[in-house]
Amino acid sequence: MAVQQNKKSRSARDMRRSHDALEPNALSVEKSTGEVHLRHHVSPDGFYRGRKVIDKGADE
């Protein structure tokens, strides 16, 4: 089991944790429909980069 040699100071601990913060997800607005979706993902209505890529009627 790993055991530290010396105690880490509060400053060293906090500096290490400075990169751990979560960032909000990057969102995009679909050009053709104005729908908001995650970057590099198909929008809920089946459009991606202005083109219809999924036909929702065929699934149902």
Swiss-Prot record:
Q: Which UniProt keywords apply?
A: Ribonucleoprotein, Ribosomal protein
Entry annotated with the keyword Ribonucleoprotein: yes
The record, for InterPro entries, names: Ribosomal_bL32 (IPR002677), Ribosomal_bL32_bact (IPR044957), Ribosomal_zn-bd (IPR011332)
Region of interest called Disordered, as start-end residue ranges on this chain: 1-60
Compositionally biased residues, Basic and acidic residues: 11-22
Which biological process terms from the Gene Ontology are attached to this UniProt entry? translation
SUPFAM superfamilies linked:
Zn-binding ribosomal proteins
Q: What GO molecular function annotations does the UniProt record carry, in alphabetical order?
A: structural constituent of ribosome
Name the domain of life this protein comes from. Answer: Bacteria
- Report one GO cellular component: large ribosomal subunit
| Claim: Ribosomal protein is one of the keywords in the record | yes
One Pfam entry name: Ribosomal_L32p
Q: Which family does it belong to?
A: Belongs to the bacterial ribosomal protein bL32 family.
The name on file for this protein is Large ribosomal subunit protein bL32
What is the organism of origin for this protein? Stutzerimonas stutzeri (strain A1501) (Pseudomonas stutzeri)
